[in-house]
A protein has these predicted regions:
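Boundary at the C-terminal end of the N-terminal hydrophobic targeting segment
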Residues: 18-20
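Sec-dependent N-terminal signal peptides
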Residues: 2-16
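Short amphipathic alpha-helices in soluble, non-transmembrane regions
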Residues: 71-84
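Histidine/cysteine-enriched polar flanking segments
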Residues: 37, 88-97, 153-163
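Helical hinge/lid and interdomain linker segments adjacent to catalytic or ligand-binding clefts
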Residues: 23, 27-33, 64-73, 116-164
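Non-catalytic propeptide/linker segments at domain boundaries
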Residues: 81-111
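N-terminal, post-signal-peptide region of Sec/Tat-exported proteins
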Residues: 35-74
Length: 164
């Protein structure tokens, strides 16, 4: 009887410790089927007050998100590849990234930035590579031009994209 209790306790504890807690959006060329939309998913999560980690130089700059049904569903809707990770898998990845022998870093993202793109009025998204990419990725942005700059409206944005 004691053996059965110990066995089921072991199985239960193993199941709890290996439960899914994170979603990895891989960004390497072989694992991600829609890179641009993956950026959009990350922005969407930040906009919904989830925190994300950008795993620089890990599998193409992957994103680590909390596991939530609505995130999984949104990934499926947008055609974004994702992997479900347990706590122990997440710890292994973060330990690898933090190793002094690796050129990697984990950057915590906490807030969706308000984005402005410096572009003339009346342009269609496909007229400009940046607006095309942001539109396709479903990342909201505001087109601004000289009038807004002269009216001191740059202060309203966290990120300004200028063409070079």
């Amino acid at each position: 009887m004691i053996r059965k209790i110990l066995f089921f306790t072991f199985i239960f504890l193993t199941a709890i410790s290996s439960r899914a807690s994170f979603i990895l959006l891989p960004m390497d060329e072989t694992s991600q089927q829609n890179h641009l939309k993956a950026y959009g998913i990350t922005y969407w999560c930040l906009n919904k007050n989830y925190k994300a980690s950008w795993l620089l130089n890990y599998r193409g700059g992957s994103f680590l998100l909390p596991d939530a049904a609505e995130i999984r569903k949104e990934c499926q809707i947008r055609g974004v590849s994702f992997e479900v990770l347990s706590d122990s898998e997440e710890t292994t990845i973060l330990n690898e990234i933090s190793s002094p022998s690796q050129n990697m870093e984990s950057v915590v993202l906490e807030k969706a930035p308000k984005i402005a793109v410096y572009t003339p009025k009346g342009k269609q998204p496909w007229d400009d590579a940046v607006t095309l990419v942001l539109t396709y990725a479903e990342i909201p942005f505001t087109p601004i031009y000289d009038e807004e700059v002269l009216a001191d409206q740059l202060l309203l944005y966290d990120w300004l994209h200028l063409h070079h």
